[in-house]
Amino acid sequence: MQSLTPSSSGINIKLLNRKKIQTHRVTPSRVVIKCVYRFDSVNAGAAAVNTGVVNTPASNNTAGHVGASRTDWQSSCAILASKVVSQQQDTEKSGGAGNITAVNGHKILNLDLLPVESNRAKPLTITDLSPAPMHGAQLRVAYQGVPGAYSEAAAGKAYPKCEAIPCDQFEVAFQAVELWIADRAVLPIENSLGGSIHRNYDLLLRHRLHIVGEVQLPVHHCLLALPGVRKEYLTRVISHPQALAQCELTLTKLGLNVAREAVDDTAGAAEYIAANNLRDTAAIASSRAAELYGLDILEQGIQDDLSNVTRFVMLAREPIIPRTDRPFKTSIVFAHDKGTSVLFKVLSAFAFRNISLTKIESRPHRNRPIRLVDDANVGTAKHFEYMFYVDFEASMADVRAQNALAEVQEFTSFLRVLGSYPMDMTPWSPSRDA
């Protein structure tokens, strides 16, 4: 018997030896819906016998719900502990288990979800911890969003035969790999139109995962709505903030001077419209999302530039061994020390060795947000403190890269290699069918 205790929750789960069991699938709820599972007494008893899960007093909030077997982790509708806590806080603020404020301020009643059969992947749950796959088992890859998201397509491109695991937040995908729920995570890091995904840069520093690869995915946006809805009926458009930014000019050219509201992900916007029968709202998402959620495509290729590409990074618990027989890229993060022209000196370490930089991104140093002029001027900010993220074209197996980082370390108070990994050299061209 093996006991797994995730650090992010007080739930103690005991898993017995695996065996093939018969389980029920349940329809997933979105983040904005408070879910309650309802089983009849026969099903509840059968689930307890089949799964062999021992519920402890610390796991009362999972008692009588979906079991914690490996099959169930893909079928559950709960979320990781961070979201459970935030959901409880929302309930306390609202004064009880009444109506819950959902996306864009709409009210949604609590739902009792009955077990139904569905082939669609289900969100993760903290009760679904299971050991890493045995040798030869299918690779499990976490991505942010729901089925139909561009991140799901990127996961399929990076690992063609993987089992994609949807996560409701970027941080949940990081936690899924750290807790051995998933073997890899594929997350967006930058877009050719919308720029950097700052949230993921911050998470790369907070978590100890390693970048083991990258994949570039051409993004083809569509305007989706319920069947029968016309563009002139629309009063708002919802999607991920990056998607809204990537389609801003095109929406204006289409005469859609409507409210534009941000949600967690593109496919989630399509799912939200379908689930709530919103006939005055359109979503910006992929054509696959239209197929999955029964929406019509009002316009195709609405991104402002057909050469719209998102770069994703592949994350793992352990780094890969760098090589020199193919193009490699290395990602680092550092905080420069006090002194004049420090950033220039750091960048010169690469220039003197003919190492090309492909990206440099600055993010505020959270532990030291500002630097003061002197003790006599307390409260006067001289300048902000920053962390710098740099990508350069060289492998850590290359002596030039090793010497460059040795020199960089002389001028920095903090330096960390996020990963040294093969570059995505797959050729692509702008296409309306991407």
Swiss-Prot record:
Keywords: Amino-acid biosynthesis, Aromatic amino acid biosynthesis, Chloroplast, Lyase, Phenylalanine biosynthesis, Plastid, Transit peptide. Pathway: Amino-acid biosynthesis; L-phenylalanine biosynthesis; L-phenylalanine from L-arogenate: step 1/1. It holds the Pfam family PDT. GO terms for biological process: L-phenylalanine biosynthetic process. The keyword tRNA-binding does not apply. Its EC number is 4.2.1.91, 4.2.1.51. GO terms for molecular function: arogenate dehydratase activity; prephenate dehydratase activity. GO terms for cellular component: chloroplast; chloroplast stroma. Residues 331-422 form the ACT domain. Residues 1-43 form a transit peptide. It catalyses: prephenate + H(+) = 3-phenylpyruvate + CO2 + H2O; L-arogenate + H(+) = L-phenylalanine + CO2 + H2O. The keyword Lyase applies. Expressed at low levels in petals (corollas and tubes), stems, leaves, pistils, stamens, ovaries and sepals. It is found in: Plastid, Chloroplast stroma. InterPro entries: ACT-like_dom_sf, ACT_dom, Preph_deHydtase, Preph_deHydtase_CS. It comes from the Eukaryota. Its main location: plastid. It is an enzyme of class 4 (lyase). Residues 140-317 form the Prephenate dehydratase domain. Converts the prephenate and L-arogenate produced from the shikimate-chorismate pathway into 3-phenylpyruvate and phenylalanine (Phe), respectively. Involved in floral volatile benzenoids and phenylpropanoids (FVBP) production. This is Arogenate dehydratase 3. It comes from Petunia hybrida (Petunia). The gene is ADT3.
